[in-house]
């Protein structure tokens, strides 16, 4: 996995200034996400694998030896460079981690990362087993990973996180013990965890579910404070029940994907991959306001400053 820094500041040359190679990840999802003040750049694995400091491991040992992960790369704004020596990684289960977003305002200090294939399916169609995609879609839900990067940062600075191949790595055991990592069921095969401008809600769409789910940060924090969990995953990570974290669900259409925000309160736009449409909807009330047909199998979309605390509205690019 690699992260690239390009100089796009006004008057600059738009050339690549830095390429950072991950010392542990063998793959990553093609998306980099920054915390509100660009303290960190979030990079998640996509396909679980043995970390780079481990040799070959057969698929038969997938559950025990393969791992996912989420790295918070420290960014020095004065120098315009990523600082690997001040970055850190969360070890995560061998689920396929997907897109991320950082909390803002009320949820500042926390990060949210999707996942798919929590079935930990490894294929085998040549042996008469279901195709990989089918095996990775057999459950109704996957997991939203909730990480407390602010507290993790303090542990790293205090020298309380062990190094691995030159990178501080917070093991799952340490993350659980320190209250840094939680899981929440989400509609299966999601693609996008989008934090609302006020930081109060997290919007998740599952490509294989017609509903878009809106999670409440306040409810998530209440469940954590009360120790209200429905159980643990196979790696001991506490699971917050979906019903205890959910604010509302909205049935937007087929294949909801990526969400961006309007300048008007509670208004968002979500791409519908299967319907080839964009839905305009109220995420506070869970009501569809409008739909428009658009390019075949639309993917991501963007509104003017639509992922900031002050979206500008005016235009949507699909």
Spell out what each predicted region is:
Residues 1-318:
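Predominantly soluble domains enriched in secretory-pathway, periplasmic, or organellar proteins
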